[in-house]
Swiss-Prot record:
The lineage of its organism: Bacteria, Pseudomonadati, Pseudomonadota, Betaproteobacteria, Burkholderiales. InterPro entries: NA-bd_OB-fold (IPR012340), Rib_uL2_dom2 (IPR014722), Ribosomal_uL2 (IPR002171), Ribosomal_uL2_bac/org-type (IPR005880), Ribosomal_uL2_C (IPR022669), Ribosomal_uL2_CS (IPR022671), Ribosomal_uL2_dom3 (IPR014726), Ribosomal_uL2_RNA-bd_dom (IPR022666). Residues 38-53 have a biased composition (Polar residues). GO terms for cellular component: large ribosomal subunit. Belongs to the universal ribosomal protein uL2 family. One of its GO terms (biological process) is cytoplasmic translation. It comes from the Bacteria. This is Large ribosomal subunit protein uL2.
Length: 275
């Protein structure tokens, strides 16, 4: 994997920085593990915009990822590493001894030809998946389940990981990259090691068109709108917002907490915020 600064042949390429990985597969993905997906452009089933700044972008198939890793005791060989346009992490195509192929999130350090295992008897090695009750305290883990059998939900993006801090009864404490400490049931599964493609954060898009390829539309400032469109809008000429920053619906932004999921608050031992 290499960081490549593009030759400045145009203003759009002057600031562009790419992450090049020559180990990735250059052919087509495994057809049996592809699914179609249509662009929603941020609209819900009524056609109303529920998520702004989405639309357009290149069409691509969804790669069906195995987030459960439930084929216990069956060794799997890494056939190849692939790029996935749906996520920041790379993915690995693994071939199980019974002939089945699956995609998984590619862990850091896992190479083509390496053998992976899952289950409570799997060795503590990068890429292997075990129940948290069988993982030693202090181990770096990723792809962590929040409910047993539901599939990995935490620490799945490029370069992320968590640390297993302690086990108390039927729960374990896990520290995430954000600093948050959460309780997780010991029957939940996690994968040893970190997620690969850790240099993803070093890339520079370089130009607005590259974001349009990814389906990201422009973000218009509130002060550039009319009063009917945003609380910051209006005024003669260039004017300040005239109030503390808020969203288009009047909710304070820039640090204002909006989390209201009281049902899972008991699972958070320490919040990521300092105060």
């Amino acid at each position: 994997m290499a960081i490549v600064k593009v030759k400045p042949t145009s203003p759009g390429r002057r600031a562009m920085v790419k992450v090049v990985n020559k180990d990735l597969h250059k052919g087509k993905p495994h057809a049996a593990l592809l699914d179609t997906q249509s662009s929603k452009a941020g609209r819900n089933n009524n056609g109303r915009i529920t998520t702004r700044h989405q639309g357009g972008g290149h069409k691509h198939h969804y790669r069906v990822i195995d987030f459960r890793r439930t084929k216990d005791g069956i060794p799997a060989k890494v056939e190849r590493l692939e790029y996935d346009p749906n996520r920041s992490a790379n993915i690995a195509l693994v071939l199980y001894a019974d002939g089945e192929r699956r995609y998984i999130i590619a862990p850091k350090g896992v190479t083509v030809g390496q053998q992976l295992m899952s289950g409570s008897e799997a060795p503590i090695r990068a890429g292997n998946t075990l129940p948290i009750r069988n993982i030693p305290v202090g181990t770096t883990i990723h792809c962590i389940e929040m409910l047993p059998g539901k599939g990995a939900q935490m620490a799945r993006s490029a370069g992320t990981s968590a640390m297993l801090l302690a086990r108390e009864g039927v729960y374990a404490q896990v520290r995430l990259r954000s600093g948050e400490i959460r309780r997780v049931h010991i029957e939940c599964r996690a994968t040893i090691g970190e997620v690969g493609n850790e240099e993803h954060s070093l890339r520079q898009i370089g130009k607005a068109g590259a974001n349009r390829w990814r389906g990201i539309r422009p973000t218009v400032r509130g002060v550039a709108m009319n009063p009917i469109d945003h609380p910051h809008g209006g005024g003669e000429g260039r004017t300040a917002a005239g109030r503390d920053p808020v969203s288009p619906w009047g909710t304070p932004t820039k640090g204002f907490r909006t989390r209201r999921n009281k049902r899972t608050t008991t699972m958070i031992v320490q919040r990521r915020h300092k105060r």
